[in-house]
Amino acid sequence: EKYSDQISLEYVDLLQNPSLASQYEDVQIGDIIVSSGNRTQTLTAYDLFNIESGSYYGSYIASSKAEQAMTSAILNVTSTKQIQVALLSGHGEQTMEGLNQLLQSNNFAVSSINPAVEEIGEEVDVLLWIAPINDPDAQVLERLERFLSENEEKTLLYFADTTQPQLSNLESFLERWGIRVQSNSIIETDNRKIINMNPYFSTSQISNLTLTDTMTDTSIPFARPLEQVFESNMELNTTVLLQSSESASVIPYGISDEQLENWTPEEYGPFPLAILSEKSFEDGKSSRVAAFGSAVSLSDSLLSSGSFCNSDYYLSVLNTLTHRENVISIQSKTLGGQELGLNTAQVFLIGSG
């Protein structure tokens, strides 16, 4: 009320006003009801905080998400349209609960689709395919191609992972869109650029700002390198979005610790870590496939980290590709101290200052 005459705030005692409880489903004492017209959303205390379990103190409040929960609820009851995001399932995909919460908190409607047994509806705007381990058959890929080719302004975001086996059918599908996923792992050879003393864990460089504002320190750890099959081919055009450092190299799968000690880099970066392919239609609209080399970049810890901008980056990608305007991105606020997530060079610089 202090900052906007469009919002009113009222405190209600359910004990004195029991009729209010009958108007809303499962409302309890302490809940927050956000209402606009005939649309409502109820928030509980668990919606306002991230709860974690510790070995010494049991469950505790790790961070506050009150701002994102309240803002999301207001957007949900006032927005005329939600972007529909569907997670592809049925092929051993990884589950990222933190990603689901981030999307829902930023007013995306999230569902699940198994393309092996059902068609992809026209109401879906974005498909997310996170590190499947089983190769899809021709019918699944035909449904994906139909979704992207017969409907304008549709998007598929694919996330690879170093634990995946060879997926010949899926990889051939991506190559037709100009994206090749290589069967190697990115490893950083410059100790000053690695994080937590892990050569597979370093920050990436944003090589194209089309989908983002100016950002730094997006982490794409445990990544597979990508390759542009072509820059332009008929109605398809590809763009590198993220890349490794120039000192990064690639290492074969399955190498032992002993072999790693004697391993010598033969090729250096930068290597593409994210590639966008756009298919243009005659009316100027397009559909898109974007591939990312790391499913780990969607992990709960990186999306909620204050040291990296992974959540900001992926929200910006989704907002831009779906033409969402006048949106705000809100992440959880950690209560108390937090690790800085510095690379080795930054640690030495601070330590010598």
Indicate where each model-derived feature is located:
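Short, surface-exposed patches at the edges or C-terminal ends of soluble domains, predominantly
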Residues: E1-G353
